[in-house]
């Protein structure tokens, strides 16, 4: 028979090892539950790649990059217009709408709806993307989200019903027929923009998604 003191001496270290193993496993469990500061995803679609998709406490953040294979003008420089008619470039803005549970974020030239008349269509500014070069962009959609389209009234969107996110970027082939104009916004930042007619017929799109809506981060 073993001496009781010796048996206890053998059992105690084993218990301590088991407890230590449980303590070390807790961070892995928290990580598996998605408790990360940001949710990063990557998915390519031709020239466009989404490099990050995060649902923060105050905004949905989408970061993307564009990679040039042929010379194009990227239509991703949106602006806001004041009551006095002044334009202000909005580097974080995208057109926002919901379609069947998908939050669609668009940076492109949009057609004027047939049921309305406008004095002048909204034409975003453009950036040159040359072969072998890259451009980056960031979109921040403030929460709670709202529809943001150039020819429609803003209205709230129900975040709980949005299951995924789609990104669409417009671009124009660099051809002689493309008419570009030089301008500046209300604080003097330069802007190049195309004529609406030639651009709306030549515009092409790069799409990524739908991507799963990320979990909202905790403060």
Please give the residue ranges for each predicted region.
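Low-complexity, acidic Ser/Thr/Pro/Gly-rich terminal tails and inter-domain linkers that flank the onset
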Residues: 28-57, 72
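Short, well-ordered beta-strand segments enriched in hydrophobic/aromatic residues
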Residues: 60-68
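Short, surface-exposed ligand- or partner-binding patches at beta-edge/loop junctions that are enriched
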Residues: 143-182
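Beta-strand-rich interaction surfaces with strong enrichment in secreted/lumenal proteins
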Residues: 50-52, 123-129, 154
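C-terminal motif of bacterial Sec signal peptides marking the signal peptidase cleavage site
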Residues: 19-21
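Bacterial signal peptide processing site
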Residues: 23-25
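Short Pro-Gly-centered flexible turn/kink motifs
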Residues: 127-141
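The feature marks short-to-medium sequence segments in extracytoplasmic or secretory-pathway proteins
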Residues: 71-131
């Amino acid at each position: 028979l073993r001496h009781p003191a010796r048996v206890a001496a053998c059992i105690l270290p084993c218990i301590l090892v088991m407890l230590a193993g449980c303590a070390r496993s807790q961070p892995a469990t928290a990580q598996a539950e998605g408790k990360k500061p940001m949710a990063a995803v990557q998915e390519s679609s031709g020239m466009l790649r989404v490099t990050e998709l995060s649902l923060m406490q105050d905004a949905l953040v989408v970061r993307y990059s564009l990679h040039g294979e042929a010379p194009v003008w990227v239509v991703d420089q949106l602006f806001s217009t004041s009551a006095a008619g002044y334009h202000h470039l909005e580097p974080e803005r995208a057109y926002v709408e919901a379609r069947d549970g998908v939050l669609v974020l668009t940076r492109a030239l949009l057609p004027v709806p047939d049921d309305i008349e406008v004095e002048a269509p909204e034409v975003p500014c453009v950036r040159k993307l040359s072969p072998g070069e890259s451009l980056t962009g960031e979109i921040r959609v403030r929460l709670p989200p709202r529809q943001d389209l150039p020819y429609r009234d803003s209205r709230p969107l129900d975040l709980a019903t949005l299951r995924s996110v789609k990104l669409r970027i417009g671009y124009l082939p660099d051809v002689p027929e493309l008419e570009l104009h030089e301008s500046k916004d209300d604080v003097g930042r330069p802007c190049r923009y195309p004529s609406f007619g030639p651009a709306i017929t030549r515009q092409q799109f790069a799409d990524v998604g739908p991507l799963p809506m990320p979990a909202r981060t905790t403060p």
